[in-house]
Amino acid sequence: MKGEIKMRKNFGVKTWLYPMPVFIVAAYDEEGKANAMNAAWGGIYTDNMVGICLAEEHQTTHNILASKAFTVSMATAGQVVACDYVGLVSGKKVPDKVEKAGFHTVKSAFVNAPVIEELPMTLECELVSYDPETCHMVGRIVNVSADETVLGEDDKIDLDKLRPITYDPIHHHYRVLGEKVGNAFSDGKSLK
């Protein structure tokens, strides 16, 4: 029968969406010590803002609310162990977890937040809002910085060099984002 959907299984309400970015969110505490956490529920909110779901009980959330600034770095294939680690342990229980992960930080030149040197792409953000009921945090992107090692010939970020990872919420795996399959805002013109 035309229009009939075959071979489709229903799973109910799940947080299954691809790709799910792996963000490493970092902020300073009141003493100026860097803390970071792994966050997968987030993305671009508007043309100059990022939105992330962060529970109020996280140390990183507390630090962001106090400092009004944070960074968001893309987790990469080369740093998967360290990126997973900062999501496994709490900064409340392991105050030196950034160091234990093997990360080194420098202060952003644009906001009062740490840039993790081992993660080559970072969004440097000012806090815009946080809703404790929904755990939704919005940050204004003040700057995007990238290590020169991940830049292509066009002097822009090259995904093949960056090798960002995505989280598979179904199987609890990390995967590297894949190959180029087309040209945005271009390939669809063939159907006009």
Describe each model-derived feature in a short phrase.
Residues 2-192:
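Basic, polyanion-binding surface patches
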